[in-house]
Amino acid sequence: MAFMRLGSKSEAFHREGQTWLCTTGLVSDVTIEVGDMKFHLHKFPLLSRSGLLERLIEESSTDDGSGCVLSLDEIPGGGKTFELVTKFCYGVKIELTAFNVVSLRCAAEYLEMTDNYGEGNLVGMTETFLNEVFGNWTDSIKALQTCEEVIDYAEDLHIISRCVDSLAVKACADPSLFNWPVGGGKNATSGQNTEDESHLWNGISASGKMLQHTGEDWWFDDASFLSLPLFKRLITAIEARGMKLENIAMAVMYYTRKHVPLMNRQVNMDEQVIETPNPSEEDQKTCLEEIVGLLPSKKGVNPTKFLLRLLQTAMVLHASQSSRENLERRIGNQLDQAALVDLLIPNMGYSETLYDVECVLRMIEQFVSSTEQAGIVPSPCIIEEGHLVKDGADLLTPTTLVATLVDGYLAEVAPDVNLKLAKFEAIAAAIPDYARPLDDGVYHAIDVYLKAHPWITDSEREHICRLMNCQKLSLEASTHAAQNERLPLRVIVQVLFFEQLRLRTSVSGWFFVSENLDNPDNQHGANGGLLKPRGENVRERVSELEKECMNMKQELHKLVRTKRSWKNFTRKLNFKKKSECCKPKDQATPAI
């Protein structure tokens, strides 16, 4: 850590309680009060260094020559800083460091200790040392932290802006090229001037060891010790100098985890847990609301996992509505990057549902709206025998990914007995039909919901099944649906019909290929030898499809026969009851 020694005399003061006395033996002729501290001093050393003290002493002097009493309660830095100022005026040895130079510079300005009142006065000396401090990352961090104590004076003297600019330059520079002398987080605030911290401007330590850097995140920990207002100014300056938005986002995330420890309760075991203080929930809430506005606004820069965790913490802390809406909008715009487990947000409101489905619905609607405005539509695809076949571009478009995510989310929340049918349908219907190449996911979610809500009416079952397109079910899903007793009979018949139609089309196509393969005119030389095994495979496949088709026809006939038998039985039973009711009493069967 940089330092500068001023003065040459030995200690000339001693303290008695809250009073400082001079040991020179001369009687004090001026008493200066700073807060609850009293300094019994002499006029001449003060008059020769401070313009303010010169005026105050002249105004307070009496004709009888008695000592005067002055009050300097507004001096920057308080009694501790004025103690150093007093020693400087008396020529006693003091040491300027990154921890005291800012308050001394502000106090010197307040006391008007310019070179007009003696060469090498405190204003000039502290200004010279500040320029040295600004050349060093660790010292600049320490100095910026102390600005909090004298914020107004430091602002007027442009100390904060100069310090922030120097830090921004170093953070944006390549440390491997410039060898900025960086320190480690805790050492930056400990105030210990260890041997390892004694280094030159180029980063070479006094012991001959080169300071090590750990990549682009080397400055995150040091910056996290700043107060939120100063951290915001540093991030703004760094962003203005063109740092990558991804690095800025990571720095803000690091700061958030440190100052909003409630977020760390949701950290997975494989994630780094940052040691944090224990601020109040109100302080955490204030910090979170400020952080939301500090995050880069560009889509995809902030990890969706972090945004979802931040949103959940905002709900716990009852953050402002604008902050939560901001987070929901950010998450919605990049919902395709979310993981299912992170969407399972516990319900913090008055609703009876286990999860906050209203919040997720708003984010889905935001995503659909943003993609439609951008004109993003999934590439066309073909569904052949229940399997996706690519046609051109990759099918994993953002909209398709979100459709899969939403179907998985519906399957997770469907077992909640308090989840209303209307809300389930609203979430499923929020995804446009073109976003689902297959409807297997939404079918699975519907099946889970029907299983968890067996009391819903037949009309409601019919209504919820309209969310899926039976033509877009895979072969496996169709087979399951055809045997699913929870589905309405109309839906089962529809599934069987479309599956039979699909199989018939496939069989016709395979027969066409088989006939061409059997034609000897199409087999010549080596090509005939290659096509013969293929023809055998085609015949086997055709045989399998015919068997599957016959099985489905039999299942369909069984369902229809069962339904007809039940109707005939019911009709006969009703006819028998009516016949018995219509018999005359005198024709009743006599008792045996």
Swiss-Prot record:
Residues 217-502 form the NPH3 domain. Keywords: Phosphoprotein, Ubl conjugation pathway. The modification Phosphotyrosine is found at residue 443. Residues 28-98 form the BTB domain. Pathway: Protein modification; protein ubiquitination. One of its GO terms (biological process) is protein ubiquitination. Gene3D superfamilies: Potassium Channel Kv1.1, Chain A (3.30.710.10). Pfam families: BTB, NPH3. InterPro entries: BTB/POZ_dom, NPH3/RPT2-like, NPH3_dom, SKP1/BTB/POZ_sf. The keyword Phosphoprotein applies. May act as a substrate-specific adapter of an E3 ubiquitin-protein ligase complex (CUL3-RBX1-BTB) which mediates the ubiquitination and subsequent proteasomal degradation of target proteins. Belongs to the NPH3 family. The BTB/POZ domain mediates the interaction with some component of ubiquitin ligase complexes. This is BTB/POZ domain-containing protein At5g03250. It comes from Arabidopsis thaliana.
